[in-house]
Amino acid sequence: MTETGVRNGAYGADKFGLKNLAGVTWNPGAPQLYEYALRAGEGVLSADGALCVDTGIFTGRSPKDKYTVRDANTESTVWWGGNQSITAEQFETLYQDFLKHAEGMQLFAQDLYGGADPSFQIKTRVFTEMAWHSLFIRTLLRRPETAALASFVPELTIIDLASFRADPKRHGCQSENVVAIDFTRKIVLIGGTQYAGEMKKSVFTTLNYYLPDKGVLPMHCSANVGPDGDTAIFFGLSGTGKTTLSADPNRTLIGDDEHGWGKDGVFNFEGGCYAKCIKLSAEAEPEIFAASNRFGAILENTVLDPITRKPDFNDGSKTENTRSAYPLESIPNASLTGRAGLPKNVVMLAADAFGVMPPIAKLTPAQAMYHFLSGYTAKVAGTERGVTEPSPVFSTCFGSPFLPRDPSVYGNMLRELIAKHGVDCWLVNTGWTGGIYGTGSRMPIKVTRALLTAALNGSLRNVEFRTDPYFGFAVPTALPGVPSDILDPVKTWADKAAFDVTARKLVGMFQKNFSKFEAMVDAEVRAAQPEAKLAAE
């Protein structure tokens, strides 16, 4: 077996049972990985130097193919209501079959950190079959100094073999695609998919399991910090504006997706960004556009012009989930340390397509826990069915697929941190106003930015608030530069009776969704539900 690159010779591939390999390329950089990927036909170059790849039949994560080992350690610590299980014996069979499948392969190995805070980071070793997968994870996680590689001992090991095909009967899974996590052995096996995001989210899931016991709240969020050191956290599901609103030229970007909140502040789990790039333009998002069109970037499933090799970001023929992976240092105002102080503001973003939520509301710690556990946004049904009625989306803690522990673990931690540090918490509606989708209009981005600026700089602390009759949270009645009517959603509707019906309908959806959390929370959080306010009428 031929091994090249800087590595810990005493802790090589054989420690994990990887034997009879053609070789291992240890910790190669971007130029090497470009060469390997292009030579193997894994991708092509764009005109500006990005590596363009197709991920095959899987153009996104496959949650139904993700499994966690159920053993004596995880029986009582994993949230089995939201995670699929396999036995330790099934995992061992899968592991041995992975090792057998890898024989004769030339693998790539990266030694990386998950987490910018040395006190809480997890040393992660990733073996991949494909060169571009090695480049991807090297870009997304945090790279040690070269000198540290010679003594690197991993705490978490990921083996990603895209050509492996699982056997449902033999391995206890549902299909040939599999992502299996053994928290006890700290091993992740990924097979049957070329979608690189599975690696990144496996590290996130692992940190979500271990960090709460260390007093750190892991979060699916973006974060930035102002010139005075005031940190802000932005929770939000896809399409709510999390990336756009946290990218503020007047504030330093900490990260766009995964963070931890510990006793000393907030830290990024990653060293790169993984941005959706459908309809990406230089005009709307100049920093992301520039970062995506340069050497070192990876473009997933993006259509290239066959002659000019320029990417067509408007072409979603392969998937709407086109992605760009690039190093954080490609963003001009990004923090390279990945660390900031304790948050002063927490923002929960919701694109309310029902048009009944105010553009901004202030939450109590109990209300914050309620809305964090709810994880609400709304999407519009596809026009191919001729339906314009919005449908609610609830993803607990704004990251349900990545939560190995009971949601109340994360919810209680957030509530306690907000109360302990006197953090202001805001719910921001980036969705519709003046009616539901199809009748109303999208909340003006200028209004959202003005309200966010006022929230983050403390201006909203000095205004008058009213209590929303449906949701019970506090809503500002006026703010200089913002039309007062837009702050009270009922005033933007022509049909007031229709507003009442729609608002009550959405409250009912919240109630139905939250019923599964009733037993997890205390009386104060139960009282923070919308139903408590309506029942009092």
From Swiss-Prot:
User: Which family does the UniProt entry place this protein in?
Assistant: Belongs to the phosphoenolpyruvate carboxykinase (ATP) family.
The record's section on Pfam families has: PEPCK_ATP (PF01293)
The family database entries (PANTHER family) matched by this protein are listed as: PHOSPHOENOLPYRUVATE CARBOXYKINASE (ATP) (PTHR30031:SF0), PHOSPHOENOLPYRUVATE CARBOXYKINASE ATP (PTHR30031)
Q: Where in the cell is it found?
A: Cytoplasm
Catalytic activity annotation: oxaloacetate + ATP = phosphoenolpyruvate + ADP + CO2
Q: Which organism was this protein described from?
A: Rhodopseudomonas palustris (strain BisA53)
A Gene Ontology molecular function term for this protein is: phosphoenolpyruvate carboxykinase (ATP) activity
Query: Which terms under GO biological process does the entry name?
Result: gluconeogenesis
Q: What is this protein called?
A: Phosphoenolpyruvate carboxykinase (ATP)
CDD domains named in the record? PEPCK_ATP (cd00484)
Q: Which domain of life is it from?
A: Bacteria
Report the pathway entry.
Carbohydrate biosynthesis; gluconeogenesis
Keywords on record: ATP-binding, Cytoplasm, Decarboxylase, Gluconeogenesis, Lyase, Manganese, Metal-binding, Nucleotide-binding
Q: What does this protein do?
A: Involved in the gluconeogenesis. Catalyzes the conversion of oxaloacetate (OAA) to phosphoenolpyruvate (PEP) through direct phosphoryl transfer between the nucleoside triphosphate and OAA.
Q: What's a single GO CC term here? A: cytosol
The record's remark on the cofactor is: Binds 1 Mn(2+) ion per subunit.
Residues bound to ATP: K201, H220, G236, L237, S238, G239, T240, G241, K242, T243, T244, E285, R323, T448
Q: Which cofactor does it need?
A: Mn(2+)
Which Enzyme Commission numbers does its entry carry? 4.1.1.49
Residue positions binding Mn(2+):
K201, H220, D257
Can you tell me which residues bind substrate? R61, Y195, K201, R323
